[in-house]
Amino acid sequence: MNNLLLINASPRGQGSHGNQLALELVSSLRQRYPHLELVERDLGANPLPPLGMDYAHALTTPTPFDAPLFEVSEGLIGELERSDALLIATPMHNFTLPAALKLWIDYVLRIHRTFSSGPEGKVGLLKDRPVHVLVSSGGFHQGERARQPDFLTPYLRQVLNTLGLFDLQFTYLQGLVFGDEAVRATLDEARSALSLQPLFNPLVCA
């Protein structure tokens, strides 16, 4: 049975345009895959505990699983490992990731657990699976109207590659601060693009 992990990184939670589009996509996927199971992690509604000295110290000890925060890390990694596909809905904050998504990354990107490191660099330990990222922004950072840099896309791509995830797609919702008409236009454009290339085509029903 197919398993989809949805990460909502917006502090606006269910009210974010990215998350609303993500839930539309989930509904569409369920029509194609009736047995699809959804695991939704809302990082805004249910924030993760901050990392501190105890966690940093545990990373360097021979028995790291004694640290309570490692239970959080293992739980998040387990959600990722059990998923057949990953859908991330995230805003762009100050040219890059929101703090909530960065914290999720810090929990799941763990040496000797989700990646190894050797003379040739870091190697992901997770099995590859399709990943789709919905990026929402008030301004424009892609295309002819771009007026700001995008550090989110290359950084998140590198993080996912380090985990072992290479089947990546990004969809951008831009110009969301320019009123209701602009919001409708960017959502319609995204829906149109996604209709031409259905999400997670490689998934098969169990």
UniProtKB/Swiss-Prot annotation:
Cofactor note: Binds 1 FMN per subunit.
Pfam families: Flavodoxin_2
Keyword line: Flavoprotein, FMN, NAD, Oxidoreductase
MF terms in GO: electron transfer activity; FMN binding; oxidoreductase activity, acting on NAD(P)H as acceptor; oxidoreductase activity, acting on NAD(P)H, quinone or similar compound as acceptor
Name this protein carries in UniProt: FMN-dependent NADH:quinone oxidoreductase 4
Superkingdom of the source species: Bacteria
Gene: azoR4
Cofactor: FMN
Keyword Ribosomal protein among UniProt keywords: no
Function: Quinone reductase that provides resistance to thiol-specific stress caused by electrophilic quinones.
EC number annotated for this UniProt entry: 1.6.5.-, 1.7.1.17
InterPro entries membership: Flavodoxin_fold, Flavoprotein-like_sf, FMN-dep_NADH:Q_OxRdtase_AzoR1, NADH:quinone_OxRdtase_FMN_depd
Chain residues that bind FMN: 10, 136-139
Subunit structure as annotated in this protein's UniProt entry: Homodimer.
UniProt similarity note: Belongs to the azoreductase type 1 family.
Reactions listed under catalytic activity: 2 a quinone + NADH + H(+) = 2 a 1,4-benzosemiquinone + NAD(+); N,N-dimethyl-1,4-phenylenediamine + anthranilate + 2 NAD(+) = 2-(4-dimethylaminophenyl)diazenylbenzoate + 2 NADH + 2 H(+)
